């Protein structure tokens, strides 16, 4: 395994990567890229880093997990405005439903735990790939469904 003296810094690295993502988002959105573009980039990063975490081992695998902080940094700040855009008088209801949807995120850790017991904690990360693929779909096409140009 990885020495505790090294492993203890991975949480800090994850938070640092997330902070970098926040700062990039503050600087780049909307001046240099749209929220949809940021979400596309972060979705791809999530897919790549997750696959990297599963297919590598040791320090490199854990580093990919830490890099997920960067991939996840702009997810919610991009999903929320894209989802409520154009809702008009239903914006309050749409916002409330999005906030309640956070509870759905509480289900995946349970599924991950179950998969970890069946396979391994590393292989259970495959669960995240379809999630990131769905977010990518939302960034590319899903947020446009039902909206007029």
Regions found by a protein language model. Give the residues of each.
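Loop-to-transmembrane helix entry
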Residues: 1-17, 92-96
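Structural signature of the two symmetry-related core transmembrane helices
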Residues: 37-52
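Helix-to-loop junctions at the C-terminal end of transmembrane segments
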Residues: 21-34, 116
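Intracellular juxtamembrane helix-capping segments at the cytosolic ends
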Residues: 73-88
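A membrane-interface helix-boundary motif in multi-pass transporters
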Residues: 37, 111-131
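A late C-terminal transmembrane helix in Major Facilitator Superfamily
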Residues: 86-119
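Multi-pass alpha-helical transporter architecture, strongest
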Residues: 129-149
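Short hydrophobic/small-residue motifs within alpha-helical transmembrane segments
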Residues: 14-20, 102-104
